[in-house]
């Protein structure tokens, strides 16, 4: 629901700053915790980066080791991790991550300031397939073919380590929180010949600097330049009235466009029709416009899409009162509203013909009016609530209540 965030920002740039830099007292004796350590094999001709999870062996309270790694070629590392403070179970991010190879610093992430322009690019350093398909977040300590983010203080060779056959390497990871608590991982790598095979993907290679148009009878897909951060492979299929686009393995920089050709229908049917994302549970409304004989929607995710229609108006019900009830002792007036197909677009409430503020809580489908907002001279009050869904269907609820 609605809530408030406080931020400390630099006056000149408006960049968010780490508030702990300004002496806020926080009790913290807990070390950052590592949940998973992932070894990646970045390859020149592979769109998807092969990876494997490494076993972590606890040496003491602050140090872990991995078994000896024997491989060759370029490797990178990724970590699933979190940090806690005393007296709190919240899982926070860490303050600093450092990677050293043979005693030399290769990567240094430090979260003392952020840039809002970074927020759209954070999925570049997150293992996107694992996040979308396995629901956990691994932060990669390598960063290919991209402009550095604000919190990347230093990075050598894009954070990748080139393992040469016959040579040995010591890799040390250090995770720190702001209070100085730290956790370490020690790794030893021996250069041995090893062939890493990338998983092949079916579909069309999409290069970020090009645009693509895919016509499919009465459905089209348009992918502008810079839709993806990096090269992607996508497969587009038309299965009956379903437009299927996948796989869900690549992060988006910008949305792309899907189009469904309009049929000869009356104006009401046209207005009530929209593009929906199809899931196992339900069809989800997507903002849709009519353009040049097509229904058009901008999307920034893979999935199955179809045309849907919503001819059912929203529902409105009294929640904590009954019509013609005395409400003199009530502090709030609650109205339940819902629309199971395209969803609520807007609402408006009046009492005795005068607009009043209703606060909307979408998770509970609840409108709430605070009686302390207004004083009324009369005892009989006419309530009117109008709700409109995303395709323009409307419902009006009118009733009377009494209050001194």
Predicted regions span which residues?
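Conserved, short, structured surface segments that act as functional micro-motifs
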Residues: 1-43, 48
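Surface-exposed loop/edge segments in extracytoplasmic proteins
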Residues: 18, 104-109, 241-244, 280-289, ...
């Amino acid at each position: 629901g609605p809530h408030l965030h406080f931020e400390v920002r630099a006056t000149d740039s408006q960049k968010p700053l780490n508030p702990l830099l300004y002496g806020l007292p926080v009790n913290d004796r807990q070390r950052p915790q590592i949940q998973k350590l992932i070894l990646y094999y970045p390859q020149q001709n592979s769109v998807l980066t092969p990876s494997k999870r490494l076993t972590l062996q606890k040496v003491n309270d602050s140090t872990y080791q991995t078994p000896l790694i024997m491989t060759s070629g370029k490797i990178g590392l990724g970590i699933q991790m979190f940090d806690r403070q005393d007296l709190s179970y919240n899982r926070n991010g860490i303050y600093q991550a450092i990677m050293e190879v043979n005693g030399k610093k290769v990567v240094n992430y430090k979260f003392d300031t952020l840039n809002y322009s970074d927020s759209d690019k954070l999925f570049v350093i997150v293992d996107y397939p694992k996040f979308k398909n396995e629901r956990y977040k691994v932060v990669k300590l390598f960063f290919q073919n991209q402009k550095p983010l604000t919190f990347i203080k230093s990075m050598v060779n894009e954070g990748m380590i080139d393992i040469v056959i016959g040579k040995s390497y010591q890799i040390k990871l250090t995770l720190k929180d702001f209070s100085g608590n730290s956790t370490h991982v020690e790794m030893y790598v021996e250069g041995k010949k090893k062939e890493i095979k990338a998983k092949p993907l079916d579909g069309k290679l999409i290069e970020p600097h090009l645009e693509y148009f895919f016509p499919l009878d009465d459905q089209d897909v348009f992918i502008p330049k810079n839709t993806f951060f990096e090269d992607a492979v996508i497969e587009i299929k038309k299965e009956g009235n379903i437009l299927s686009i996948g796989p869900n393995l690549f992060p988006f920089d910008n949305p792309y466009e899907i189009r469904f050709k309009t049929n000869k229908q009356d104006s009401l049917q046209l207005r009530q029709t929209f593009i929906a994302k199809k899931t196992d549970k339900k069809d989800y409304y997507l903002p849709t416009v009519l353009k040049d004989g097509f229904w058009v929607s901008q999307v920034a995710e893979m999935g199955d899409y179809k045309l849907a229609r919503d001819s059912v108006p929203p529902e409105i019900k009294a929640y904590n009162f009954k019509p013609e009830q005395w409400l003199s002792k009530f502090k709030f007036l609650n109205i339940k509203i819902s629309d199971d197909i395209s969803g609520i677009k807007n609402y408006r409430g009046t009492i005795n013909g005068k607009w009043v503020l209703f606060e909307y809580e979408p998770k509970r489908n609840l409108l709430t009016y605070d009686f302390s907002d207004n004083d009324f001279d009369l005892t009989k009050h006419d309530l009117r609530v109008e709700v409109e869904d995303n395709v323009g269907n409307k419902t009006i609820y009118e009733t009377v209540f009494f209050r001194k």
